[in-house]
A protein has these predicted regions:
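N-terminal pre-P-loop "Q-motif" helix
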Residues: 67-71
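Membrane-proximal basic amphipathic "stem/tether" segments
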Residues: 1-57, 247
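S-adenosylmethionine/decaboxylated-SAM
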Residues: 38-63, 73, 82-252
Length: 252
């Protein structure tokens, strides 16, 4: 197919999809959705051989797409000079957590992976699609095996149970990166409020579910937190992530 024809057809398709009206979930009318179709096409992971090698190892053990995994990878790779450990809450089968462990190059850094291993918990009135128990098709053994395959078993610590209620005392009190992938309002809020005073300056918080239909509870929680806490820079990425960067301690 000729280049001009490809461009013409692409433009027509994009134009049609973008012309569709925005929409919202019936249970969360203030969180609006639309066809997010940026024209940008740069795919930096294509030339990142180190990332692609890791991606091929972990991709079958995660529900996170390559765009979000690459963002986690690049963020983690920039934190070698930031003191603190990594924490992921909402692990599923360990793919994204082990990717973080492989990305982090700081000597002595631990990666804590917390999950109930029984599926989503704390679904409530703020949530639109989740009722509890979803994504329960996992197990501790699957995560431990993934850590062995990735050769990060010495750095990874798996925490079983509801976080922070059942296992937070096992996590260090200084965190450089927090990845929250829990799908619902209350669980995301509880994790963030527990972690906030433990985040060092320069730490990064990534919310996996912020931009997705069906996860409006997480969207609402993040928006509320940002308006109430001035010590963070907030980025809404069109890949679905929300990213917070801690720039000041409480009260500064």
């Amino acid at each position: 197919m000729k280049v001009w024809l490809k461009r013409r057809l692409t433009g027509l398709c994009y134009g049609y999809l973008r012309s569709q009206h925005d929409w919202a979930h019936d249970k969360s009318p203030k969180v609006r959705h639309a066809r997010v179709l940026p024209m940008a096409s740069h795919a930096p992971w294509v030339n990142d051989a180190a990332f692609l090698k890791v991606y091929e190892t972990v991709r079958h053990a995660t529900l996170v797409d390559i765009m979000r995994l690459y963002e986690l990878w690049t963020l983690a790779r920039q934190l070698d000079n930031v003191e603190g450990d990594f924490l992921e809450v909402g692990v599923w089968r360990g793919g994204s957590g082990c990717l973080l462990a492989m990305a982090g190059q700081r000597e002595g850094r631990s990666v804590f992976l917390a999950d109930t291993f029984t599926g989503v918990v704390k679904a409530g009135a703020h949530d639109t699609s989740y009722s509890g128990g979803e994504h329960g098709d996992t197990g501790v053994d699957l995560v431990l095996e993934m850590a062995k395959r990735c050769r990060v078993a010495d750095n990874v610590r798996v925490l079983v149970g509801m976080f922070p209620e059942n296992n937070a005392e096992q996590v260090s009190d200084r965190l450089a990166l927090l990845h929250i992938d829990v799908d619902v309002y209350e669980s995301a809020r509880d994790v963030l409020l527990w972690a906030a005073p433990r985040l060092v300056r320069g730490a990064v918080v990534v919310f996996d579910d912020y931009g997705f239909f069906g996860c409006e509870g997480v969207t609402r929680m993040v928006n509320e937190f940002v308006t109430q806490n001035s010590g963070y820079r907030f980025l809404h990425n069109l890949n679905g992530h929300a990213v917070l960067i801690k720039v000041a301690d409480h009260g500064e």
